[in-house]
Design a protein with these regions (language model features):
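Mid-to-C-terminal alpha-helical segments outside catalytic/metal-binding sites
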Residues: 2-16, 25-93, 121-129, 150-153, ...
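Histidine-centered catalytic micro-motifs
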Residues: 16-23, 196-199
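Short catalytic/ligand-binding loop motif for oxyanion handling, primarily in non-cytosolic enzymes
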Residues: 23-26, 94-96, 102-107, 144-148, ...
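Short glycine/proline-rich turn/loop motifs
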Residues: 60-71, 100-105, 235-244, 354
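Divalent metal-dependent hydrolysis catalytic cores, especially in the metallo-beta-lactamase
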Residues: 65-74, 83-106, 133-139, 161-165
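Aromatic- and glycine-enriched glycan-recognition loops and surfaces
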Residues: 72-80, 115-121, 146, 173-186
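Active-site-proximal gating segment of KS-fold condensing enzymes and close homologs
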Residues: 112-126, 228-229
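Catalytic pocket-lining loop regions of alpha/beta-barrel enzymes
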Residues: 128, 133, 140, 152, ...
């Protein structure tokens, strides 16, 4: 691995990490989730936590933070240790998304609604104990409009630093661009609370049924397409030859609804992040939306800004470290929308994300390293 670029060294300690993950002790998770489900995840964690392998990895994490992944990683569950990990990695602030328990908190059941509230109370307190350095975002179950709006009001008043919303199905059986949801977006805008969608929002890793937004699992029912490490700590998502390549489809559909449905026009200061879907899809989407807007203009449907301009202003996405950010910018522009992430402590984030992204940003230009690692991400860290 090449040495850290001088421009990256200059921003060390200021870096904003737009995708980290929060683990929970299995007993804490069981208390929060209750009857909502996820028992297999809890059982799996209980079998691992406290084993010789876990204890050895935890000890290693104190001196080799980047290499240890999963619940054994430094600060995976503990807010004080997470701050130590951030200092070690040169990161100023980090957004934390749930490691597991995605689908279970978003189904249309009373148990899911109760679990969602308990989770939100937990992460608001956790974030305070991390001195606001590590910001664990709340989750909003959007199967019922009135409940979703009431819970959003509640967590905003509690001091939520962001909210994660589902993107596998239309919220409360209608488009997120429907005027019915305007009060929801207005509250986010007025409170300066970022909204996020995240890979796995349909619970593909924790549900037997298909993710409604993605191709049926039968398409990947082949030995050569199955997950690479389904049982490895930190590899809970279906990382493999198929899933990661199609997982961005949910983000494309949701973002298309918001842009073409006028949500960012009605709420110009709304902050929105599409997290861990990668970034290679964003430039082509912008091109398609701009072309379609030009066609619509010929029949009297007009947008004050180009769709790509709304995206550059309001939306941030997290490239994977294997994606050539410099090439994407050369081809499509949209440089403002790309932000840094580690995926820590998930294994997909790798051990050298700062160096790898630094090599790419250096090829873009002298100023882009600071933009990518710090300035672009400020939209998601009000």
């Amino acid at each position: 691995m090449a040495a850290v670029d001088a421009d990256v060294l200059a921003v060390t300690g200021e870096i904003l990490d737009c995708d980290g993950h929060l683990y929970m002790d299995p007993d804490v998770m069981a208390e929060i989730v209750g009857a909502a489900g996820a028992s297999w995840i809890i059982d799996s964690l209980r079998e691992y936590v406290g084993t010789a392998a876990d204890l050895e990895a935890r000890e290693q994490s104190r001196t080799d933070t980047w290499s240890v992944k999963g619940i054994s990683a430094l600060g995976s569950c503990d807010p004080a240790d997470r701050v130590v990990a951030l200092d070690t990695m040169g990161i100023h602030r980090q957004l934390l998304f749930p490691n597991t328990v995605l689908r279970e908190l978003r189904t249309h059941t009373l148990a899911a609604l109760g679990a969602c509230r308990r989770y939100n109370d937990y992460v608001v307190d956790w974030t305070r104990r991390a001195d606001d350095r590590a910001r664990a975002v709340c989750q909003i179950n959007m199967t019922d409009y009135d409940w979703a709006l009431a819970e959003l009001r509640r967590v905003v008043e509690l001091g939520a630093r962001g909210v994660l919303i589902p993107c596998a199905e239309p919220p409360a059986d209608t488009s997120p661009a429907s005027p019915r949801w305007d009060e929801f977006w207005r509250l986010l805008e007025e409170s300066d609370t970022p909204a996020f969608i995240h890979i796995g929002a349909g619970g593909l890793a924790s549900a037997e049924e298909d993710d409604p937004m993605l191709p049926a699992r039968r398409w990947a029912d082949a030995p050569s397409l199955r997950a690479v490490f389904p049982n490895r700590p930190g590899g809970e998502e279906k990382f493999g030859p198929f899933y990661v390549v199609v997982a961005h489809l949910a983000a494309e559909v949701y973002l298309t609804c918001l842009v073409m449905g006028g949500v960012f026009e009605r709420f110009p200061s709304l902050r929105f992040g599409a997290i861990e879907f990668g970034a290679s899809w964003l430039g082509p989407l912008c091109e398609r939306l701009d072309r379609h807007a030009a066609l619509l203009d010929k029949v009297g449907v007009r947008y004050p800004l180009l769709p790509s301009e709304y995206i550059r202003r309001n939306v941030r996405v997290t490239p994977q470290w294997v994606e050539p950010v410099d090439v994407l910018i050369e081809r499509y522009g949209v440089a403002e929308s790309y932000v840094f992430s580690t995926d820590y402590p998930h294994i997909e984030g790798g051990r050298h994300p700062v160096e790898r992204f630094g090599e790419m940003t250096a090829r873009v230009g002298a100023d882009y390293t600071r933009a990518f690692f710090v300035e672009n991400g400020q939209l998601l860290f009000p």
